[in-house]
From Swiss-Prot:
GO cellular component: cytosolic large ribosomal subunit
Stated family: Belongs to the bacterial ribosomal protein bL35 family.
Record-level GO BP terms: translation
Keywords, sorted A to Z: Ribonucleoprotein, Ribosomal protein
Protein name: Large ribosomal subunit protein bL35
Ribonucleoprotein found in the keyword field: yes
């Protein structure tokens, strides 16, 4: 049986934590920053967890994660 391929796009966007949850970064920090409030930009810098509904799909993309 050949090895399963990791989806490289997903590998760059998601990290699996020690407990098996999946960490992701928030979008909206690349351009048009002047229009966004400082509070909003500060909140967007924090990482977030993938919700349980999407976790199963992301794990299929990261077979060795």
């Amino acid at each position: 049986m050949p090895k399963m391929k990791t989806n490289r796009a997903a590998a760059k966007r998601f990290k699996v934590t020690g407990s098996g949850r999946i960490r992701r970064s928030k979008g909206g920090l690349n351009h048009c920053m002047q229009e966004k409030s400082k509070k909003r930009l500060r909140r967007l810098r924090k990482n977030d967890m993938v919700d349980s509904a999407m976790e199963k799909r992301v794990k299929l993309l990261l077979p060795y994660g």
